[in-house]
Amino acid sequence: MCIPIHPNLDSTMINHPLFVRRERVPGNKKEVAVGSCATRLVKSLMWGSLLLVSAAAFADNAPLSTQIVDLANKVDGVHPGYRAFHAKGVLVEGTFKASPEAARLSSATLFNGGSIRVTARFSDGAGVPTVPDGTPAMPRGIAIKYHLPGGADTDMVTNSFKFFPVGTGEDFRDLLTAIVASPPTAPHPNKLEQFFGTHPNAPKAIGSLPIPDSFADEEYHGIDAFIFVNKSGQRQAVRYVVAPEKLVHITAEEAAKLPPDYLFDDIAKRIAQKPVVFHLKAVLADPSDQTKDASQPWPDDRKVVDLGVLTLTKVVPNSKEAEKKLLFLPTNLTAGIELSDDPLPTVRTAAYSVSFGRRSQPGSASSN
């Protein structure tokens, strides 16, 4: 029987990886779920920890990025050679061609109208490389590396969250601390329920995640705000959207009947048959819109500009090996695109870098 976590959470959210702790059974190489809905198979959290440790574990003043990676490795285990976040993924290649409107908004080289080679990575938003693709309330992602003329790169990191559960790295750590302090046996209201009470967009963000029928049929959002600067010096705050040609979601019941790797099997078959096409779009902020808090969505009526077409044509051979060398960093920008006052890109880049450094050491933790 599932233990209610929060009055606004339905059964799908209760089964979300955030609320299911995994342990290893002696003599069994597989991880099993314990706690709420313990009969479910391996689940993973997007970022987080369910281990029963206190916030005092961070009394050594470790950097925030280190705390986040430590928690991620503790909850999902260390999987050498895999990323600590979005562990299960596949690399694809293709091109991007910008629209004329993109160049009016930003002087960035990738918007000059030429064909830009790209390497992209589709992924499940969990830290376990064997997580079933149909796991409910789990974000899916696409990270894109644009290979610019002259040899430089710039990155975009997007996922299926329409907005993030929290707005700062500190709030994310506090969310993890609340999860840590809220085992199934904790009295109610537990720390997680209290956190949701003061951060109402957190359960809304997690509960709004759909299940796609294909990576090709999902919409991905750049939850953070960036600043476009055009040749005249005009500045415009934007949030990215990577939009499919069609958007198709399925129910949890339908997903449960599919193979555990159905998203990855499907994308390989689709690209082999014909290119997979997305439209890169920018949601334009109104001068009155805040840019600092990724947990606060902008109004739905904001202008959306089509920046260009992303055409994916090939799965990278030996993708698992190839992706180990790649980092997709939200702060890896190019002239014409700048950071806003949103703190999360810097926090994410720092965490990915910590994790990458650990993976680079033989026998150590995985990374992004």
Feature names for model-found ranges:
Residues 21-24, 40:
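Basic polycationic patches enriched in arginine
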Residues 2, 9-11, 36:
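Low-complexity intrinsically disordered segments
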Residues 32-46:
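Bacterial N-terminal signal peptides that target proteins for export
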Residues 60-368:
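Active-site-adjacent core segments of small-molecule enzymes
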Residues 6-10, 15-16, 28:
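Intrinsic-disorder-associated, low-complexity terminal segments enriched in Asp/Asn/His/Tyr and depleted
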